Amino acid sequence: MTSPVGLGMPEGPAAVLAPRRKTRQLQVGSVGVGSDFPVSVQSMCTTKTHDVNATLQQIAELTASGCDIVRVACPRQEDADALATIAKKSQIPVIADIHFQPRYIFAAIEAGCSAVRVNPGNIKEFDGRVKEVAKAAGDAGIPIRIGVNAGSLDPRLMQKYGKATPEALVESALWEAGLFEEHGFGDIKISVKHNDPVIMVEAYRQLAAQCDYPLHLGVTEAGPAFQGTIKSAVAFGALLAEGIGDTIRVSLSAPPAEEIKVGTQILQSLNLRPRKLEIVSCPSCGRAQVDVYTLADEVTAGLEGMEIPLRVAVMGCVVNGPGEAREADLGVASGNGKGQIFVKGKVIKTVPEAQIVETLIEEAMRIAEEMEGDSTTGSPVVTVS
């Protein structure tokens, strides 16, 4: 008897994700960072930090979007002078981002920031100031993030490796961490960012194998919204699926709140965050008998802000439509100018095409009310197809 052909599929169900890599635990203000805590989502303000009102307004918007920790730039003395007010009034922990001038590190610590990010590649004579920084941060009880970036790597390492290789990024980070450890300071988080997701992933893999510091994931200078989303999703997905990564920041040339939406969705897609509204929709084809794109967009807009985990399916034809709709909490299979509305796999009504969106939104709201009053809520999803 001929043996079956192997198709490379697992013989049994495989674990969705590897276990989280074990790390030391840190506190960034009220947010725990490390393997004992959920992966947190960060962003960075685009305002001038010395414009306190604008910065606090943007932090409020980020907080409303689900941001856990926010970073602010501190390139000038007037920015350093604003840190105390911002740190005090922010609803979420504030990290000061320091480049070039070491004196701003001490200003940020004195101002009450929850952590400080330092770039060892461009801070003047940084190695010689580590002892002072370690003492100041230790006395204040705040962590330091060593943020190595391919675009500002130490010239000595550029000369050694020729370019920003994974090995160069890792060596820079671990060298600086070692200096802090020599002075008795171990509340350290590390990032090794590169704009190439492949190099970035390899750098983090090497780093994860050589230390137990919590790791902040980021693809630096990822680009405009679409390109940056793809780069970050590819890199973060690879690492988080291996259990690597404790905080993330999706870097986009877009409003900061968009970074939070993308980052949160990445975590939800990996089941690292509870799912909320999920809309599943088909890509459409010649079989579609309705405008699936418009239908999906209108349903999404109508349910924006829904916090209940709900899966909604919007399907454009009878091939996959009924099956997908039955698998969702709520769905529609469209065709011939009408739509069959499914709830929990059962057809509850058929409505004219013009009433599909209105009906789906009404049913979603009704289901949401029921789920809010039900302590045994599962994790429903919305699928548009």
UniProtKB/Swiss-Prot annotation:
PANTHER family: 4-HYDROXY-3-METHYLBUT-2-EN-1-YL DIPHOSPHATE SYNTHASE, 4-HYDROXY-3-METHYLBUT-2-EN-1-YL DIPHOSPHATE SYNTHASE (FERREDOXIN), CHLOROPLASTIC. Converts 2C-methyl-D-erythritol 2,4-cyclodiphosphate (ME-2,4cPP) into 1-hydroxy-2-methyl-2-(E)-butenyl 4-diphosphate. This is 4-hydroxy-3-methylbut-2-en-1-yl diphosphate synthase (flavodoxin). Its EC number is 1.17.7.3. One of its GO terms (molecular function) is iron ion binding. It catalyses: (2E)-4-hydroxy-3-methylbut-2-enyl diphosphate + oxidized [flavodoxin] + H2O + 2 H(+) = 2-C-methyl-D-erythritol 2,4-cyclic diphosphate + reduced [flavodoxin]. Pfam families: GcpE. GO terms for biological process: isopentenyl diphosphate biosynthetic process, methylerythritol 4-phosphate pathway; terpenoid biosynthetic process. The keyword Nuclease does not apply. [4Fe-4S] cluster binds at residues 282, 285, 317, 324.
